[in-house]
């Protein structure tokens, strides 16, 4: 695929007032989500739930793409239409999570490195044939006493850049996600410092490995205090700190940035995004790539009556998409 085609896909992913829904939960994660609302974790229930999300009427009004898990990209609607085809036919770009998860980084207690580079070229080639047009790889950066180390950041951004280069070789837009974890008692200045260091290293690694930024999307953490920090930040503080951090680290040529919700409540994730988009002018579109913050309310409703509440749960998904779509324009009223 040409650079022009990659750039076109990347720009479509961050189209004005649209974001990306993350439904790429691993088997273990979806098991926890289902268990929390009393749904049996079997393949048909997982398929039905993903169908609920992906076939929500008019979803493409506010959703440009969806990140799928390996199981989901191979599944179909009840009517037998493969999910990637259904999505493409309804204006939603299919994406695929390709990393194999984060594991302890040898020699660095309390730190993690994401695995999954082995065999990635062949997997990306297959995913492209299955209909995927972008991919996602998540790195995990913890904040604690004397962490993250430079070694941890370097190991993770090197893997992100290798993944990104392989994606572009195979015609997929790489979404690079260095998640700075909210867990901990660190304050907002510590979150800023770690996020800034991580993003500086990431874009240096992308440059060194010849990744074309015009065909790349950043999935970023907001700069936010740890969940156990006594001094929580206001909506405006989070918005201003996040935008300042991004402006100091992210090249303006990047097509756009989408945020992860990272354990924020539905209302927080939407309010923070909205406040950021009121801080004009911005060099790039700021939108969303939420998982829990898009799904949780709908999942709870669906669990109460999986047949009877199917359409009602889809309406909840649509409303959450609309709220976040408005926030991506700075027009959410709360």
Curated annotation (Swiss-Prot):
NCBIfam families: FrucBisAld_I. Its EC number is 4.1.2.13. Transmembrane segments: none annotated. GO terms for molecular function: fructose-bisphosphate aldolase activity. Keywords: Glycolysis, Lyase. This is Probable fructose-bisphosphate aldolase class 1. Belongs to the class I fructose-bisphosphate aldolase family. GO terms for biological process: glycolytic process. It comes from the Bacteria. It catalyses: beta-D-fructose 1,6-bisphosphate = D-glyceraldehyde 3-phosphate + dihydroxyacetone phosphate.
């Amino acid at each position: 695929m040409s650079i022009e085609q990659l750039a076109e896909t990347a720009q479509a992913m961050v189209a004005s007032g649209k974001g990306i829904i993350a439904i790429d939960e691993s088997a273990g994660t979806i098991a926890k989500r289902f268990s929390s609302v009393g749904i049996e974790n079997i393949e048909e229930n997982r398929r039905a739930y993903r169908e609920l999300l992906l076939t929500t009427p008019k979803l493409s009004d506010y959703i440009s793409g969806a990140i799928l898990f390996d199981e989901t990209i191979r599944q179909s609607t009840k009517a037998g239409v493969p999910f990637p085809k259904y999505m493409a036919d309804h204006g939603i770009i299919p994406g695929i999570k390709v990393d194999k998860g984060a594991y302890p980084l040898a020699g660095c207690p309390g730190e993690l490195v994401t695995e999954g580079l082995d065999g990635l070229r062949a997997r990306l080639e297959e995913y492209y044939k299955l209909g995927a047009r972008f991919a996602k790889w998540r790195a995990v950066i913890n904040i604690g006493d004397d962490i993250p180390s430079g070694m941890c950041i370097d190991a993770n951004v090197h893997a992100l850049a290798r993944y990104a280069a392989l994606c572009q070789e195979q015609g997929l837009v790489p979404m690079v996600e260095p998640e700075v974890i909210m867990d901990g008692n660190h304050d907002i200045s510590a979150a800023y410092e770690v996020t800034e260091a991580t993003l500086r290293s990431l874009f240096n690694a992308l440059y060194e490995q010849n990744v074309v930024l015009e065909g790349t999307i950043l999935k970023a953490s907001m700069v936010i205090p740890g969940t156990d920090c006594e001094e929580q930040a206001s909506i405006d503080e989070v918005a201003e700190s996040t935008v300042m951090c991004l402006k100091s680290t992210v090249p303006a040529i990047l097509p756009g940035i989408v945020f992860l919700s990272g354990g924020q409540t539905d209302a927080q994730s939407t309010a923070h995004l909205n406040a950021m988009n009121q801080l004009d002018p911005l060099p790039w579109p700021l939108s969303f790539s939420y998982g829990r913050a898009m799904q949780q309310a709908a999942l709870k409703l669906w669990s109460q009556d999986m047949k009877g509440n199917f359409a009602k749960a889809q309406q909840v998904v649509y409303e959450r998409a609309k709220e976040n779509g408005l926030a991506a324009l700075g027009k959410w009223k709360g």
